[in-house]
Structures are given as structure tokens and as C-alpha cells.
């Protein structure tokens, strides 16, 4: 009889357990669904972060390839400037230096061709409007012949590598002539 009571108690507990566990299961399902949604959201974020890291790494590698020559090219610019200055200062009519002058011209042409091949472009803005992003004004000079803020003279060419400024052009910029004030004699 004690065994029957134990079995009855177990049967009662078993009958009540499914009702309680049904509510518990529904709550548990709700919690698990929320956890699943959170895990899926987190997985999407991690995938997006991974994609962003890959994209940034690809961009960094591309920039490294594109601008790897920046320091080397910057170190070559004074050599090019010296060759150009030597040509400017030498007399083209002097027959005694003609072979040397031709050699410098050919060397300079080879330099320019090589620079062009690696997308290193000269900025020679003579006569163009002043552009503060590419030019550095070394002086201002009054001029009635050209528009104000135009480049009158280029002291040193600028250069850009793949569109990025490597060195600004050093220039003299025009300004409008000062208005002439009438002299005392003209006033009288």
C-alpha cells in the first residue's frame, strides 16, 4: 500500500509537472529565441567587422604600393632641380660648353621620362591662378599685366606622386597695383 501511495504521488507529480513545465518551456523557448537573435546579430557584426578589416588592409597595401616611392622620389627632386638650374644658368650660345649642356639636357629628359612612368608629375604653374593646395607663395609682386593672384614666376617646381602632393611649387604671386594717389601738385 505504501507502494501504491508512492506511485500515486509520483503520478500526481508527473501530471502537474507537464503543466508547470509547459509554462517553463514557453519561457525557456522565449529566452532561447532572444539568445539566438542576439547571437545572430553578433555574428553579423563580427562578419561586418571582418569585412571592414579586410577592406582596410587591402587599401593599406594599395597605398603602400602606390606611395612606396615617395621618400625616394623626394630625395631625387633636388638633383633634378640642380640639373634644371645648371641649364638655366649656362649660356646656350657658348660653344665650349655645348656638349656638356646637351648631356645635361639628355640626362634631364631621362629623369623626366622615368618620373612620368612612375606617375611623378611636375607642377609648373607659371601664368596659372595661385592654388594654395599646390603652390607656396614666396613673395607678392604688383603687376598690371596679369590678373591678381596669378603666378608670375616659379622659383622651384612642385611635384605630385599619384595625385598626392610631394612638394609644393615655390612661386611669386601677382597682386593688383596700388592705386596711385594724386600728388600735391595734381590736387592744386
Curated annotation (Swiss-Prot):
The gene is grpE. The keyword Transmembrane does not apply. It comes from Pseudomonas fluorescens (strain ATCC BAA-477 / NRRL B-23932 / Pf-5). Residues 1-22 are annotated as: Disordered. The keyword Chaperone applies. GO terms for biological process: protein folding. Transmembrane segments: none annotated. Keywords: Chaperone, Cytoplasm, Stress response. SUPFAM superfamilies: Coiled-coil domain of nucleotide exchange factor GrpE (SSF58014), Head domain of nucleotide exchange factor GrpE (SSF51064). This is Protein GrpE. InterPro entries: GrpE, GrpE_coiled_coil, GrpE_head. CDD domains: GrpE. Belongs to the GrpE family. Homodimer. Participates actively in the response to hyperosmotic and heat shock by preventing the aggregation of stress-denatured proteins, in association with DnaK and GrpE. It is the nucleotide exchange factor for DnaK and may function as a thermosensor. Unfolded proteins bind initially to DnaJ; upon interaction with the DnaJ-bound protein, DnaK hydrolyzes its bound ATP, resulting in the formation of a stable complex. GrpE releases ADP from DnaK; ATP binding to DnaK triggers the release of the substrate protein, thus completing the reaction cycle.
